[in-house]
Regions:
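N-terminal Rossmann NAD(P)H-binding glycine-rich loop of SDR-like oxidoreductase domains
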Residues: 4-24
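Conserved glycine-rich Rossmann-like NAD(P)H-binding loop of the short-chain dehydrogenase/reductase
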Residues: 26-36
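Conserved cofactor-binding/catalytic machinery of classical short-chain dehydrogenase/reductase
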Residues: 53, 68, 95-98, 135, ...
């Protein structure tokens, strides 16, 4: 049985990924979370790990000895990246650098999936659509910049230390159980509150001129599994 490690598995995507990997895929799964997070999952080994503490990363990888690693841990809120840029840089860049350093030091032979973001592209000229991996990155917020930096660091480590790293730029996810921090779930929550008479019949929205691709989270995690396996 193949063993996998999900780093940062207490979030929206991580929970779906854990269910899919233990269920349909039949992997032996370990999941890391922050100490203050609550995560109960009978079919996986749950481990507390601070990504900013390199020694904890070393201990977890030694304990789990995974064949595949899914690196989901991130500060993923664009709004929070503006109000707390230091946290965003620490988690998304310094935390990932800790992981990369440990992978280098132990000469990790397995495959690692690092999750970037469609936000990295930023402003895209109409003539550049449809975009590809070669489209110029013009990140327009701090979160996007940290994700771009994460993936550039990973590319350097992959070449310099022969690490098997796969990087994706995932666009917006949607699905049941998503936090109202995100746009679709926020709109849905407001609609339900209006229908229940809990608020005035007005939906508060942000910039409606932005165009984004949305993917069901269940399709996203199936694609992630394919990327580490094939």
């Amino acid at each position: 049985m193949k063993k996998v490690l999900i780093i940062g598995g207490a979030g929206f995507v991580g929970r779906y990924l854990a269910e899919y990997l233990t269920g349909e895929c039949g992997y032996e799964v370990s999941i890391t979370k922050m100490k203050q997070e609550v995560l109960e999952y009978a079919d996986a080994d749950i481990l507390d790990m601070d990504l900013l503490a390199k020694e904890e990363v070393e201990q977890v990888l030694a304990k789990c000895a995974p064949d595949y690693i899914f690196h989901l841990a991130a500060q993923s809120s664009v709004a929070l990246s503006w109000s707390n840029p230091q946290l965003t840089v620490d988690v998304n860049i310094k935390g990932t650098l800790n992981l990369l350093d440990v992978l280098k030091e132990i000469k990790y032979p397995g495959r690692v999936l690092l999750i970037g973001s469609g936000e990295e592209y930023g402003y895209v000229n109409p003539e550049e659509v449809p975009i590809s991996e070669d489209t110029v990155l013009r990140p327009g917020n701090i979160y996007a910049a940290t994700k771009g930096c994460q993936n550039m660091l990973a590319a350097i480590y992959a070449r310099a230390y022969q690490l098997n790293l796969v990087m994706v730029r995932a666009f917006n996810h949607v699905g049941p159980r998503q936090s109202p921090q995100f746009v679709v779930s926020d709109f849905c929550k407001q609609v339900v509150e209006v229908e229940k008479g809990l608020r005035e019949p007005v939906i508060h929205v942000g910039n409606l001129k932005a165009k984004r691709d949305f993917t069901d989270v269940r399709d996203v995690i199936a694609a992630y599994e394919c990327l580490v396996r094939q």
